[in-house]
C-alpha cells in the first residue's frame, strides 16, 4: 500500500468515527433539523461534521492532506483522532470557540449583570428620574417659595398660606362675608336688619313675632289688633305667639268663630280671665272626661305645689290651652 493510499484511509477512518461510532450512537430519530442522523454525545449546532485532528491540523499548518505526517494531531492509541470523552469535548470546544468564553461573558456579564441590572436599574432608581421626582421633589409639597404650577397646588398654598381655608379668596373672608355675617352668629348678635326681617328673623324679634317684616303689622297693622285679640288672646299675645309656637294658645280654638263673636260683642281684651275662660268652655263644649281629668291634675298640682300642673288642670277643665305653654 502506498503512502498516499494510507493517508487517505486514515482520513476516511477519522471522518467515519466522528460522525457514526463514538461511545453511544442514537440513530432512531434525527438530532438536527436537516434530518441527518448525528451523534448526540455533544452539540453539533456549529458544524454538521466535526473534522478529525489530523485533517484540521494539516489545514491549520497550511499543508496538503497528502503531504507531511499523516498521523499529525492523532493520538497514539487509536490512530483515529479521538482518545476519550475529554478529547471529544475539547474538540467540540475548540471548534466553536468554547462554551464558557462565549455564553458567560456575552450573556451574563455584558447584558444581564452589568448593563441591564446593576448599571441600568441604578441609573433610573437611585440617580435617575425617580430620585428627582421623589426625594428632590419635596419642593412640590413643602417649599412655600415655589411659584410654578405645581407649587400652587402644593402644601404651601393650602396649608401655610391657606388660600382656600383661612387667608385666601375663598377662606376666612368668604366665611365671614357669607356664612357668618348673613347666616351665622353675627346675624343674631348684631340685629342690624331687624325691621326688615334680617338678623332676628326666627328669634324673639324676628319677622314672625314683632320685629321683622310682619312684626309691626302683626301688632298694630292690618293684622294688628284683630290678631293680638283673636288669635293670641289678650295681654300675653306676643309671648304666646312667638314663644309657644303655633300650637299652644294660638290656634287651639276656632279663631274664626271667636273673632266673629268678639267682633259682634265688642269685648276685645275687656273681659276678665274668668269671663274669657267661661266663654271658651261654652264655645268649645268641654267633655266630662276632660273636666274630670283637669280636676285631678289641678289637685295634684296643688298637692305638689306645682303651679304649672295646676294651670294645666284648669286648662283641661275649661278647654283652653294657656299661652304659658
UniProtKB/Swiss-Prot annotation:
Residue stretches of biased makeup (Low complexity): 200-210, 252-278
An example Gene Ontology CC term for this record: cytosol
Organism: Schizosaccharomyces pombe (strain 972 / ATCC 24843)
Residues covered by region (Disordered): 1-325
Signal peptide residue numbers: none
Name of the featured protein: Uncharacterized protein C23H3.15c
Comp. bias (Polar residues): 1-21, 29-57, 114-167, 174-193
Biased composition (Basic and acidic residues): 86-109, 282-325
Coiled coil regions in record: none
Amino acid at each position: 500500500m502506498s503512502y498516499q493510499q494510507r493517508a487517505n484511509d486514515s482520513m476516511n477512518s477519522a471522518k467515519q468515527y466522528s460522525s457514526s461510532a463514538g461511545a453511544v450512537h442514537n440513530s432512531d430519530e434525527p438530532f438536527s433539523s436537516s434530518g441527518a442522523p448525528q451523534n448526540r454525545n455533544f452539540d453539533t449546532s456549529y458544524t454538521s461534521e466535526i473534522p478529525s485532528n489530523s485533517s484540521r491540523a494539516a489545514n491549520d499548518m497550511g499543508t496538503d492532506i497528502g503531504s507531511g505526517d499523516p498521523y499529525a494531531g492523532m493520538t497514539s492509541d487509536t490512530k483515529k483522532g479521538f482518545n476519550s470523552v475529554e478529547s471529544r469535548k475539547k474538540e467540540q470546544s475548540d471548534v466553536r470557540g468554547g462554551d464558557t468564553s462565549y455564553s458567560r461573558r456575552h450573556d451574563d456579564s455584558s447584558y444581564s449583570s452589568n448593563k441591564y441590572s446593576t448599571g441600568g436599574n441604578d441609573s433610573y432608581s437611585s440617580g435617575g428620574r425617580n430620585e428627582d421626582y421623589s426625594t428632590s421633589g419635596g419642593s412640590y409639597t413643602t417649599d412655600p417659595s415655589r411659584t410654578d404650577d405645581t407649587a400652587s397646588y402644593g402644601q404651601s398654598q393650602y396649608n401655610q398660606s391657606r388660600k382656600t381655608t383661612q387667608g385666601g379668596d375663598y377662606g376666612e373672608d368668604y366665611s365671614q362675608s357669607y356664612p357668618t355675617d348673613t347666616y351665622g352668629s353675627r346675624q343674631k348678635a348684631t340685629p342690624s336688619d331687624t325691621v326688615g326681617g334680617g338678623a332676628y328673623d326666627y328669634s324673639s324679634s324676628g319677622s314672625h313675632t314683632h320685629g321683622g317684616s310682619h312684626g309691626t303689622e302683626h301688632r298694630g297693622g292690618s293684622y294688628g289688633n284683630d290678631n293680638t285679640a283673636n288669635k293670641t288672646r289678650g295681654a300675653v299675645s306676643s309671648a304666646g305667639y312667638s314663644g309657644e309656637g303655633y300650637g299652644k294658645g294660638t290656634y287651639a280654638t276656632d279663631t274664626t268663630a271667636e273673632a266673629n263673636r268678639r267682633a259682634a260683642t265688642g269685648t276685645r281684651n275687656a273681659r276678665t280671665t274668668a269671663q274669657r275662660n267661661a266663654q271658651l268652655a261654652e264655645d268649645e263644649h268641654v267633655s266630662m272626661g276632660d273636666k274630670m281629668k283637669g280636676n285631678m291634675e289641678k289637685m295634684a298640682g296643688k298637692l305638689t305645689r306645682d303651679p304649672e300642673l295646676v294651670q294645666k288642670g284648669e286648662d283641661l277643665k275649661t278647654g283652653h290651652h294657656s299661652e304659658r305653654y
